Amino acid sequence: MKQKLLQLAHFFGYEVAGYRNFRGKPDPERPWEDDQTFLTAYDAVVNHTLVDRKRLYMLYQLVRQTASMEGSLAECGVYRGGTALLFARLKSKEKRLYLFDTFGGMPETDREKDIHRAGDFSDTSLSHVQNLLHGHGNVVFRPGFFPATASGLENETFSLVHCDMDIYSSVLDFCRFFYPRLARGGVMVFDDYGSLSCPGAKAAVREFCAGQGTFEIYLPTGQAIIWRS
């Protein structure tokens, strides 16, 4: 029963953590507990995202890792703007952040590969996310269907790109567009790779990597990353 409940929580994107006493020292499996910069950012975004704390902490570390690298940031699959706000808070003023989403729900999906259906996650809007990120500079909204909304960015370079698109065709389009435009040492992060509700996301990443002769790194958080060497 316990295992089934844990699996159910993971299916819907939640983390279940037990209590362990480390005599006042940080839990090595919860390194954010003594990272005040992250905790402050987390408090600002937690009510605007479905991404759990472990995955947010991974994104936080990757933003810091790529901070001095050339290239912009991008997120595809913004939903209500929580992770976009995390990026906007952490990035330098000089770095540009591109945000791609329909801001009205999912596009058509592949019934053989995806569980989600067209219109899922429609409880958001462009104006909602714009208001959430108000005051953060160098943020560019690209509303509509990706990859058409990436038109004009063919010569852009990216240091970190975050994919939270859930479905096969969108994730594959993401890989095809961003991978050749990653800076050396740049990273693609896939939020839904290990999610039981997003089998098409994992299938797309694996298909793309097989075609490129590269490999994704599956993280204990359920995310996956691809580095550009």
What are these regions (language model features)?
Residues 54-58:
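N-terminal pre-P-loop "Q-motif" helix
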Residues 1-29, 47-50:
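Boundary detector for helix-to-coil junctions that initiate low-complexity/charged tails
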Residues 25, 32-50, 60, 69-229:
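S-adenosylmethionine/decaboxylated-SAM
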